[in-house]
Amino acid sequence: MDGIRYAVFTDKSIRLLGKNQYTSNVESGSTRTEIKHWVELFFGVKVIAMNSHRLRGKARRMGPIMGQTMHYRRMIITLQPGYSIPPLRKKRT
């Protein structure tokens, strides 16, 4: 799984599953066309729309130094009716 890091399970993403929309975090350097092609090829589904937004990294303190976690991109993938993606594993914390 090159482009997709992990699935996102929030209240909104669970609500969107009823509309056949799947939410996941992807690598920040990935483009929409790369992710669309990868999802269609790997899962054998038909993607009709993709929405994405970039989320900023969070501030983290490491001793006296303030740092940041990496920025990441979140994609909401809409599939044609009749197609579905099996649940992706949840990221372990």
UniProtKB/Swiss-Prot annotation:
Its main location: plastid. GO terms for molecular function: mRNA binding; rRNA binding; structural constituent of ribosome. One of its GO terms (cellular component) is ribosome. InterPro entries: Nucleotide-bd_a/b_plait_sf, Ribosomal_uL23-like, Ribosomal_uL23/eL15/eS24_sf, Ribosomal_uL23_CS. Pfam families: Ribosomal_L23. It comes from the Eukaryota. Binds to 23S rRNA. Part of the 50S ribosomal subunit. PANTHER family: 60S RIBOSOMAL PROTEIN L23A (PTHR11620). This is Large ribosomal subunit protein uL23cz/uL23cy. The gene is rpl23-A.
